[in-house]
């Protein structure tokens, strides 16, 4: 998505607060966001690290960013962990979601 708007002059000093209020991204959590974030925290037994976070750059005027929906992370011991996910809804079919996940991770892993 491309988002445009008018920002106050002091917006650079507020970028951290802005990102904190926007993350995790709604495309990751679904809705209603507060409840889905709670469910994710209860269900997952690990810290996501950078996965589903945001990366990008800010040149003082322009901000380009992306949500890390597929991410390869090197652990302190040198092992690498590939993280990926998918959106589950009440209409999701477990078998189809599993097959889609295999397709998403196939290229980076093989």
Task: Specify the residue positions occupied by each region the protein language model found.
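Conserved hydrophobic core element of enzyme catalytic domains
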Residues: 2-110
């Amino acid at each position: 998505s491309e988002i445009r708007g008018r920002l106050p002059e002091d917006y650079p000093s507020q970028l951290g607060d802005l990102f904190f209020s926007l993350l995790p991204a709604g495309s990751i959590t679904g809705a209603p966001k507060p409840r889905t974030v709670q469910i994710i925290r209860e269900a997952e037994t690990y810290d996501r690290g950078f996965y589903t976070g945001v990366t990008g750059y800010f040149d003082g005027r322009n901000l380009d960013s992306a949500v890390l929906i597929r991410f390869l992370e090197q652990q302190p011991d040198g092992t690498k962990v590939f993280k990926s996910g998918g959106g589950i809804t009440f209409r999701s079919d477990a078998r189809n979601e599993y097959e889609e996940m295999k397709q998403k991770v196939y290229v980076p892993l093989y």
